[in-house]
């Protein structure tokens, strides 16, 4: 991973155009090929980013200022004009073991993948653990109309789970082969604050009855 703190301007050129005026920012160049631009706020969210695969070229402008061009396979570009570099370092992090789900969450995922129709009539499973540059989506499905649906599964549904699914949706909806991608937040229990946030973001909530999904008697299975 390469970490750069620099005074820079950033322009996105592609399906849309976006401009970030000159400011000190953190630039992340990851080993997977992704590049992201961060400010000292917005928590985990980058100001702009480019998903892998993408390629970086460094050029000199007529004014002598460095121009870093990040381009993906579709020709979209992040054009980073670097005015001054405060820090530039490389770090080898190695292979991350990834997030290990607890036993109940892992079993919920397996059961829901097997009985994906519990999410709605006509739902089909595309893949478990669908890979993205920021981690795997628990389930990627298609609804009765063939539209993509990303499903995040938790034992207890809290705000951080909704935020996690939001990050996946932001990334997946940039893929023209998948977009538009809807979201489903599925858990045994969903806290009111998490449900409110999910609803506000257009994410559907599903309450799962673990006992029923294992084949035990229960009258508590509900879809919301």
Curated annotation (Swiss-Prot):
An MF annotation (GO) of this entry: DNA binding
Annotated keywords: Cytoplasm, DNA-binding, Endonuclease, Hydrolase, Nuclease
Lineage, broadest ranks: Bacteria, Bacillati, Actinomycetota, Actinomycetes, Mycobacteriales
Keyword Transcription in record: no
Pfam families named in the record: NucS_C (PF01939), NucS_N (PF21003)
Gene: nucS
Any single Gene Ontology cellular-component annotation: cytoplasm
Class of enzymatic activity (EC top level): hydrolase
Protein name: Endonuclease NucS
InterPro entries the UniProt entry points to: Endonuclease_NucS, NucS_C, NucS_N, NucS_N_sf, tRNA_endonuc-like_dom_sf
Top-rank lineage group of the source organism: Bacteria
